[in-house]
Amino acid sequence: MTNDRWQIHRHLAEQADQRLQIVKTVPRRILLAGADGDNSRRLLAARYPKAAFAEYDPRPECLRDAADKRGGSLLSKLAAKTVPQHCQALSAPLPEASADMLWSNLGLATEHNPVAVFASWAGALQTDGLLFFTHFGRDTLLELTS
């Protein structure tokens, strides 16, 4: 058994990223709802190198872990490629119409009021913005073990 905290997040991020192959829209601003050890941002930055990111999560330790995984190289800071992080509940209002894409990798798993989260996400997306999220379903365990 591995002690990799982000193994399931990484697996789901990779699966969701593969689905982006059919999307023709190139987002310029991506909001990450729920830190996942930088797995999602890394994949999205490779696919959309010109996109700007902002990351939201209510857990400061998860934000710290994502920032640590990114590293803070001098070159990335000079190129203004840092990722602003915001420690807040996912149901709290996000900046209005601020994103072309909102991405959440298991961000809903710990939320008690998903309706409020979806309302916040809807407000943050621009018209015709893209919402991608992963979540556990009825058959998740069967799919992950096969």
Labelled PLM ranges:
Residues 25, 112, 126:
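Short conserved AdoMet
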Residues 115-130:
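A short glycine-rich, Lys/Arg-flanked "PGG" loop and its adjoining helix->strand segment in the class I
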Residues 93-95, 102, 106, 126-131:
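Glycine- and small hydrophobic-enriched segments that form the cores of compact globular domains
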